[in-house]
Amino acid sequence: MTLNLRVMAPNRTVWTSEAQEIILSSNSGQIGILPNHAPLLTALDIGVMKVRIDSKWTAVALMGGFAQIENNQMTILVNEAEKASDIDPKEAQEAFDLAETSFNQAVGRKQTIEANLAFKRAKARLEAVNAKY
């Protein structure tokens, strides 16, 4: 039994496939989805989605959004997403280092919030590209 997964950003369909298991970062923590999961609508945090297709795991960096599951159909609407295979590891590490420095040097509430979001995005991309299964 499988789940039909569809990940959509505002300007494109990021990914469509069948999956045996999905692990997501929701606003209330990590959640795992298996076939025949109860209907669910949840907000997603910036983080890595892990998808198992047959016995192979794949990582996707999600930049926040919503996930809905019903009748083994999972639809994920995100602000942006990148498959790990599309991320340059060197560029992801450089972006993470820069975001970490900016976060540590942030002054004031607005700058701290913006730096924190940039840091979370960079961290998600780096975790996705470095995921080992």
UniProtKB/Swiss-Prot annotation:
Per its UniProt entry, which superkingdom is the organism in?
Answer: Eukaryota
An example Gene Ontology CC term for this record: proton-transporting ATP synthase complex
Pfam entry (one):
ATP-synt_DE_N
A molecular-function term among this protein's GO annotations: proton-transporting ATP synthase activity, rotational mechanism
InterPro entries reported for this sequence:
ATP_synth_F1_dsu/esu, ATP_synth_F1_dsu/esu_N, ATP_synth_F1_esu_C, ATPsynth_dsu/esu_N
Its subcellular locations are: Plastid, Chloroplast thylakoid membrane
- Which UniProt keyword terms apply here? ATP synthesis, CF(1), Chloroplast, Hydrogen ion transport, Ion transport, Membrane, Plastid, Thylakoid, Transport
What membrane topology is annotated for this entry?
Peripheral membrane protein
Q: Does the keyword Zinc apply?
A: no
Output the HAMAP family linked to this UniProt entry: ATP_synth_epsil_bac
Among NCBIfam families, the record links this protein to:
ATP_synt_epsi
Family from the record: Belongs to the ATPase epsilon chain family.
Q: How does it assemble?
A: F-type ATPases have 2 components, CF(1) - the catalytic core - and CF(0) - the membrane proton channel. CF(1) has five subunits: alpha(3), beta(3), gamma(1), delta(1), epsilon(1). CF(0) has three main subunits: a, b and c.
Report the function annotation for this chain: Produces ATP from ADP in the presence of a proton gradient across the membrane.
The molecule here is called ATP synthase epsilon chain, chloroplastic
**Gene it is expressed from:** atpE
